[in-house]
């Protein structure tokens, strides 16, 4: 079974191709989600028989999450592919994620807060896991916006 994991809340964008839950190919792409995702997915949809797409729906760049959701939801509906979502904290060792200005999303025992970082805080890069078997993907795929509208 082919599954694709899409992380658009970081730069570069990370896209992993998984066969039987194991990573077989990864893409690290610089650029805007709206430019990069359609070009890559045109190739992926022609090359693989994709059964499921998983994308990061929280927290991070609202625009990147929104664009990814609309694009992936449309692709999944038209190609009859299952869409799931997952938190970005799963792929950066639960490290703070850039929010707005100098503030970051911080996950404290499943309680999300937005705050400034402490001086000794370490930020981890996002990484595609070698295996996606242990992750608990969510069938509720709407983007989760953690900041109020400005």
Label every model-predicted segment:
Residues 1-39, 46-47, 83-150:
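Oxyanion-binding and handling regions
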Residues 28, 58-59:
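Short, contiguous strand/loop micro-motifs
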Residues 40-41, 62:
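Short secondary-structure capping micro-motifs at structural edges
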Residues 52-57, 63-83:
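DPxDG-like acidic metal-binding loop motif
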Residues 60-61, 118:
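Short, structured coil/loop segments at alpha-helix boundaries
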């Amino acid at each position: 079974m082919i599954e694709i994991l899409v992380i658009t809340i970081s730069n570069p964008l990370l896209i992993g191709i998984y066969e039987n839950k194991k990573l077989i190919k990864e893409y690290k792409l610089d650029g805007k989600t709206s430019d990069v995702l359609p070009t890559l997915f045109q190739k992926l949809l022609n090359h693989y028989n994709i059964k499921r797409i998983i994308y990061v729906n929280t927290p991070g760049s609202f625009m990147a999450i929104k664009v990814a959701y609309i694009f992936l939801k449309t692709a999944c509906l038209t190609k009859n592919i299952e869409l799931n979502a997952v938190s970005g904290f799963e792929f950066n060792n639960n490290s703070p994620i850039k929010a707005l200005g100098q503030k970051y999303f911080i996950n404290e025992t499943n309680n999300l807060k937005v705050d400034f970082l402490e001086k000794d805080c370490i930020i981890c890069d996002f990484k595609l896991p070698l295996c996606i078997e242990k992750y608990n993907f969510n069938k509720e795929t709407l983007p989760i916006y953690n900041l109020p509208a400005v």
